[in-house]
Structure formats: structure tokens, C-alpha cells
Amino acid sequence: DKNLSKKAIKYGYNDTMKAFNKLEGNRYTFKKGQIEKNNNMYQQTYEHIMSKVLRFKNATKDFYKQLKITSDIPTKLEDKLLLRVMELVAKDFNLDDTKIYTYRSFNRAIRKELKKRIKELDTTETRKTKKTEVELYLEMEKGNYKDLRTLGLLNPIELLKAVYLYTICED
């Protein structure tokens, strides 16, 4: 298949450039320095929102225990965690993983897809426990932090993704 071949060539190019430190990212590919720029732009807001949602020391400890990491994580690990969250959101939103992104083009694509998914969301079917990052994002917009805390402990990865969505949509 012609499209499959094109995709394979793009993957090969991206991976080679990553190996030579010309591009960065794991599953998704970013121009050099873009992940750091994204972190500089959003890390503080991201952490602020996380602390607002978790609010209590025990909730924070329980949350990070769910993720199997300590709450006093060093910056390098935090950077990797934020990249992991970004890429999980992108995967859920079916972003093109052959494209080379800047942090702006990446976040723009995510915001565009988020708007589409909010429109598609069937509000009559509200689940009590397993909520998607889009549903958690909407709860965050309403300021339902108590519910978010509970749901976040049940689905820590979904909460991290929702906080990322909220962070990039607030600027």
C-alpha cells in the first residue's frame, strides 16, 4: 500500500533525526527545543491546576501513589511526565504521529480536536466512574474540583490528560 510506505518513510526519517538529536519526542515528533518551550509555557499553570484539584496533602499523596511515583518528583521526571501526558492525549485524539510539530501546532491540533469532541459528547450519558479526559476537562471548566479529586484518584492518567487540556486552553 502506497500510504503505508509513505508513513514508514516518515517514521524512519523522524526516528533517525531523533537518534541524531535533531528532533525530539517519543511517539510524536517535535522540532528541537519545542518540548522544553511547551514545559516552560505550561508547567507552572499545570502544577497550579493539579494542586487546585487535589488540594489536600493526602489526596496528592494518594494520587501520585496511584501513578506509582513520589510527589516530590525531580524536574527531569516531571518533564518526561508532561511529555507522556501530551502524547497520550494526542494518541486518544488520533493526531498524526508522522507529522513534525512545534509545541504551538501540536497544542492547536489538540484544541481543535477537543472542540470537536465536546460537540460530539452525548451529555445524557454521564458515567459515574470511568470518565474520559474530555468529560473531566468539562468538569474542570465548571470548577467541580471535589468531584474531580475523587474521579482523579480513580483515573489518575485521565485526570493528568484533562489538566493538560485545561492548561493549554486557558492561555
Model region roles, listed by residue range:
Residues D1-D171:
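Patatin-like phospholipase
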